[in-house]
Amino acid sequence: MTASEPTREARLAALRSIGHVPVLIVGGGINGMGTFRDLSLQGVDCILAEQGDFCSGASRAPSRMIHGGLKYLETGEFRLVRESAAERNRLLCNAAHYVSPLEMIIPIHSWFGGVVPALRKFLRRPAKITERGALVIKLGLWLYDLYGALNRVMPRHRMIARQDILREIPDLDPSLKIAASYYDAWITSPERLVVELALDGMAANPGNIALNHLRFNRVTGNQVELQDVESGEVFSLT
């Protein structure tokens, strides 16, 4: 916290003087805080309330991978893949101090395995895919590269010959036929990124407030009740 950043006490004092706010965001994870920052940059007045620490729930718990939705290609959700890959690329560009490329290696044990089940699943027919051969994986990664082309900052996928991948990673099963390499991303500190989003939002629109340990209690008519977890103080907004 620098001298120019509002303390929690200062933000609570500002909240006491607010009777009405157009937008109330409940939850201070990556989605809530990203919304707070976006609205602040657009000049929309808003308040964000998080009952615990920022980024203390689902945003902190996962593998910390930032993926572009590769698995959704099999179910034909191309729009979701395009959006996820674009957001991944934006994070790589805008938050490179926290988000880095991560190479993924896929050992492949057949050439044509899974072609028919993959086609049925793509057509939304019942299918169980037990194996994905080189052809299915090659096609999937080609599409993944295509949908992640906007603002690309990572290499495209590549297929790696058996002898080359075993030389590079000798502990792999030597019965593999070929391997594939593609890139997604991972984040080192999602908590720090969420805090940066909060500070960006409050700097862009100084009237906006992001507060942790502020619980959403209830809605009564057109009134919303918030409560400071630490002191028990209650705030009413319309």
Go through the PLM ranges and name each one.
Residues 40-60:
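Glycine-rich FAD pyrophosphate-binding loop
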Residues 64-166:
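Dinucleotide-binding Rossmann-like beta1-alpha1 core, especially the glycine-rich loop
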Residues 32-33:
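N-terminal Rossmann-fold NAD(P) dinucleotide-binding loop
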Residues 180-238:
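Helical element adjacent to the flavin cofactor pocket in flavoenzyme catalytic cores
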Residues 27-29, 51:
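Glycine-rich Rossmann-fold phosphate-binding loop(s) that bind the pyrophosphate
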Residues 36, 40-41, 200-202:
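Gly/Ala-rich phosphate-binding loop of Rossmann-like dinucleotide-binding domains
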Residues 24-26, 238:
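Short hydrophobic core segments
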Residues 1-23, 38-42:
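Extreme N-terminal leader/targeting segments of oxidoreductases
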